[in-house]
Amino acid sequence: MNVMQENQIKLIEHIKQGVVQAVGLEEAEVPEILLEVPKDKKHGDYSTNIAMQLARVAKKAPRQIAESIVPELKKDNKLIKEVEIAGPGFINFYLDNAYLTDLVPVILTEDKKYGESDFGKGEKFQIEFVSANPTGDLHLGHARGAAIGDSLANIMKMAGFDVSREYYINDAGNQINNLVLSAEARYFEALGLDSEFPEDGYRGADIISLGKDLAAKYGDKYVHTSEEERRSVFRVDALAFETGKLRADLEEFRVSFDEWFSETSLYEENKVLPALERLRENGYIYEQDGATWLRTTDFEDDKDRVLIKSDGSYTYFLPDIAYHLNKLERGFDVLIDIWGADHHGYIPRMRAAIEALGYSPNQLEVEIIQLVHLFEDGVQVKMSKRTGKSVTMRDLIEEVGLDATRYFFAMRSSDTHMNFDMSLAKSTSNDNPVYYVQYAHARISSILRSGKEQGLEVTKDADMSLLQTEAEYDLLKVLGEFADVVAEAATKRAPHRIVRYLNDLASSFHRFYNSNKVLDMDNLEVTKARLALIKTAQITLRNGLTLLGVSAPEKM
């Protein structure tokens, strides 16, 4: 718990005692006291609507209640500088900013751990994201999902949740059969033999490379074997080739997973039919027209869903249900699935299935990743300059850089369409959001290097009470909000709140820097305090950027 959080608790307790004295309630009767940070600094450091909450119980107007509480709040509290009533009965608090300087040694001590909290209390979450078919390159939607999923996992972990990241390998569907047939055709082609290319095959350059690899590895060994034997071998090689490519691309994107879960394993380990039987035992399965149905309309889905078709084949829904049952049986409290925009209609049926299995539908959360459109110089970009085909994640990283790609994808809420401005992402100006934040970190690093060259090291023993200017206090206030912002971003599943915070922090630092001389050899004690202050800003910028998978450069 940091200084800011401790003071919030103290302030809430002080308000509670003020209510007890002014209104005559017992402590247990006082409703939960909520503190908000006003958007306009003129309205104080914190505000509470407790007077509105008490109006019905006290049978008085909120402002009248506030007027009776405020005198109690002004009594004997060193933390509070001023209290005022606003509007219909809001109570605004202006704090004595001196307490803010206590943050500096705390941040310097916690360093990489600054921002961590036990807010999540170890609740077990699994985040499944990307999960692209192992049949080709990752596209822009996958890239956005990867950036948001990984950032969210980092944020929730820092906020005290127990988080596991998972990639679901769709390796049991018809698309894998097409992959194998495509690899087979390219294998024959690499050996100089005629072969009919499958109508729904994959024609990418990667499949040509795969065919050449197979020819180099096996020679003509599988030319004259049975189709079954050849395709069984090629299936293993093709999946290893494609998943290896996915892993490499994601690792380059600074995204890693705790588990790569194979859909095929559900069948190999007999996980599918037991899930069906559980649904049947719970009374939600029926047979109609030769098919097996799940009665999802019992759980607000718009129609019931087929699990087994009349020809005996499974729909995609049945193994998906088995997979989610497997997740829950592994002990996760909540599952977060990050899906593409085309899966939005799938949410009600999956939540219905979770409930039909006997779990709470609240144990499944779904975050939808909306579409991405690329623009350069105001013109939409649809094709890669390099390949002449659709732009892939790899293409975008090569064009604008890894840091810009990660940061830009985290800037917007996942459920909003995104226009990705490539020109802006490549610019080296303060108009570029990631450049602006990284430049603040680099500038601080430069000042610290200059100080070190003059024999000035950052120390926790500096006299922080010398930090007294408005810009210093404003910077300290923003620094003190970090852990709360992380917890809020975790709760709201909103990495873009970290982006917004980093922009605010960079702005506060730049304002401080423009109005305060840091290295003043004629005033060494103030210089030492300011060096410690900017070091805390550097730490916090770095920690925030790390959550987003973005580097914190020391030189630019």
Swiss-Prot record:
Its EC number is 6.1.1.19. This is Arginine--tRNA ligase. Keywords: Aminoacyl-tRNA synthetase, ATP-binding, Cytoplasm, Ligase, Nucleotide-binding, Protein biosynthesis. It catalyses: tRNA(Arg) + L-arginine + ATP = L-arginyl-tRNA(Arg) + AMP + diphosphate. Coiled coil: none annotated. It is found in: Cytoplasm. Gene3D superfamilies: Arginyl tRNA synthetase N-terminal domain (3.30.1360.70), HUPs (3.40.50.620), Isoleucyl-tRNA Synthetase, Domain 1 (1.10.730.10). The keyword Translocase does not apply. The gene is argS. A motif ('HIGH' region) lies at residues 132-142. GO terms for cellular component: cytoplasm. GO terms for molecular function: arginine-tRNA ligase activity; ATP binding.
